[in-house]
């Protein structure tokens, strides 16, 4: 899967309606959010085998064990090229403290809570904790 030439426009269109959407396991959690971003940029859903398979935290763990590679990082390693988090670029997938988001250079965007507001949150790069990153490749 490769980014489309207009991937930035596609990503912005994907993010806009999600800004205030609350977290929901299996529908709008960190995995489905990051996968939706990849699909917006590339036109390919990287996790079709997970869609509709879980609706709880426990269910997500079961899905990772049954159709994934056992855990989130290993599942992503099998689907994307891992890169050092210090080299993550805009549009790449980043994990910080087990939370997946989309890199926007100096920060990542993820599903979460900021005070009383639920929806998309910003996590500055300096605050990334034990980060991992995966490249969403550019087109051929």
Please annotate each region the language model reported.
Residues 1-69:
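N-terminal capping segments
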Residues 57-123:
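...with weaker cross-activation on analogous glycine-rich loops/strands in unrelated enzymes
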Residues 125-140:
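Glycine- and charge-enriched low-complexity intrinsically disordered segments
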């Amino acid at each position: 899967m490769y980014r489309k030439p207009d991937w930035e426009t596609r990503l912005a269109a994907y993010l806009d309606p999600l800004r205030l959407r609350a977290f929901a396991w299996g529908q709008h959690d960190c995995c489905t959010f990051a996968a939706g971003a990849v699909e917006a940029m590339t036109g390919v859903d990287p996790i079709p085998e997970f869609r509709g398979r879980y609706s709880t935290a426990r269910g997500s763990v079961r899905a990772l064990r049954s159709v994934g590679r056992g855990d989130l990082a290993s599942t992503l390693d099998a689907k994307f090229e891992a890169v050092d988090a210090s080299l993550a670029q805009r549009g790449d997938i980043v994990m910080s403290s087990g939370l997946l988001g989309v890199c926007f250079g100096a920060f990542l965007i993820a599903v979460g809570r900021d005070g009383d507001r639920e929806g998309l949150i910003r996590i500055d790069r300096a605050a990334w904790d034990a980060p991992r990153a995966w490249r969403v490749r550019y087109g051929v």
